[in-house]
A protein has these predicted regions:
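A generic structural signal for well-ordered alpha-helical segments
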Residues: 28-29, 77-78, 100
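Short secondary-structure boundary/capping segments
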Residues: 48, 76, 109-111
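Short alpha-beta junction capping motif
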Residues: 8, 51-94
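An acidic, glycine-rich "communication" segment
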Residues: 2, 90-125
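Short catalytic/ligand-binding loop motif for oxyanion handling, primarily in non-cytosolic enzymes
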Residues: 16-17, 46, 66-67, 92-97, ...
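Aromatic-Pro/Gly-enriched surface loop or interdomain linker
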Residues: 1-53
Length: 125
């Protein structure tokens, strides 16, 4: 069986994309079915033919602006049947791009207010 060619794409201006992207990559590297490539903070990766070799994109990106060429590259690639996994801040990417937000199925508005709460460990096993 061929491995799933997977692009781990991390970047943006708010979250620690380097640390989190590396962690995502390391976790996924334990899956023998995946052939991984990592790209950090380079939106040209979303332009065809750069996405063409991949079957799956694991997307950890925050905020930013996407050009029409990048948007069309990503949306057409997904529409062709390829896989998109948006991680955490993916819903807060490309705020001014309604087509991207429609593909993701929603968007980030705000974090709730911080508050104190109690955690009870019932069963540590």
């Amino acid at each position: 069986m061929d491995k799933i060619k997977t692009l781990v794409f991390a970047g943006g201006k708010i979250h620690d994309y380097k640390g989190c992207g590396e962690r995502i990559f390391n976790i996924l590297s334990e899956c023998e079915e995946l052939e991984l490539t990592m790209v950090e903070d380079d939106l040209s990766a979303l332009v065809s033919p750069n996405l063409d070799p991949y079957d799956l994109i694991v997307f950890y990106y925050t905020v930013g602006e996407i050009s029409d060429e990048q948007k069309n590259g990503l949306l057409n690639w997904v529409a062709s049947g390829k896989g998109y996994v948006g991680v955490h801040s993916a819903a807060d990417s490309f705020r001014e791009c309604p087509e991207y937000r429609a593909m993701v199925g929603g968007h980030f508005i705000t974090h709730p207010h911080y508050r104190e709460y109690q955690v009870s460990v019932v069963d540590s096993e």
